[in-house]
UniProtKB/Swiss-Prot annotation:
Pathway: Protein biosynthesis; polypeptide chain elongation. HAMAP family: EF_P (MF_00141). This is Elongation factor P. Involved in peptide bond synthesis. Stimulates efficient translation and peptide-bond synthesis on native or reconstituted 70S ribosomes in vitro. Probably functions indirectly by altering the affinity of the ribosome for aminoacyl-tRNA, thus increasing their reactivity as acceptors for peptidyl transferase. Belongs to the elongation factor P family. GO terms for cellular component: cytoplasm.
Length: 187
């Protein structure tokens, strides 16, 4: 059990037999009336996001989630195989569980896998990943009045928007949470 004062991003709550992860929360103290906490919760299994409001100080049941360090090894059909960094056990995760993060996975990449009762729930990548641009069209500088972007396909197959000056073969720093361009990596 946890109080609303214990809320933090990433905390997993158990509501009506389902697991929900806090994506964001905000403590609100209006001028009139009691304080409350506004949360955005993501269903760990389905990925559905809902808004929920709690009165301040309310106790909520939390789920025990074991986050384990692992390393991405390879893809085997529709499964992604990870090796636990502690006991070296291999964990195949289905493509449905990895989801859009597959576009940012490189072999030997350190990740975290969250388990609940021995069942993998979700995967966490490092916030920033370095990827090579596999293909992008040359950018034409003079064809617009403001700075523009263009699509680029990364070595993993992910497609992101990059500035016009990026070329095929450049190494980029990318935010794995939303796929946004962060900058070039100096060689």
């Amino acid at each position: 059990m946890a109080s609303t004062a214990d809320f933090k991003n990433g905390l997993v709550l158990q509501i009506d037999g389902q697991l929900w992860q806090i994506v964001e929360f905000q403590h609100v103290k209006p001028g009139k009336g009691p304080a409350f906490v506004r949360t955005k919760l993501k269903n760990v299994v389905s990925g559905k996001v809902v808004d929920k409001t709690y009165n301040a100080g309310v106790k909520v049941e939390t789920a025990t989630v074991d986050r384990r360090d692992a390393t991405y090894l390879y893809r085997d059909g529709s499964d992604f195989v990870f090796m636990d960094s502690e006991d070296f056990e291999q964990h195949p995760l289905p493509e449905a569980l990895v989801g859009r993060l597959a576009g940012f996975l490189l072999e030997s990449m350190p990740v975290q896998i969250a388990f609940h009762d021995g069942v993998p729930l979700y995967l966490e990548l490092p916030v920033t990943v370095e990827l090579l641009v596999a293909h992008t069209e040359p950018g034409l500088q003079g064809d617009r009045s403001s700075a523009g972007t263009k699509p680029a396909t990364m070595e993993t197959g992910a497609e992101i928007q990059v500035p016009l000056f990026i070329n095929t073969g450049d190494k980029l720093k990318v935010d794995s949470r939303d796929g946004s361009y962060l900058g070039r990596v100096n060689a």
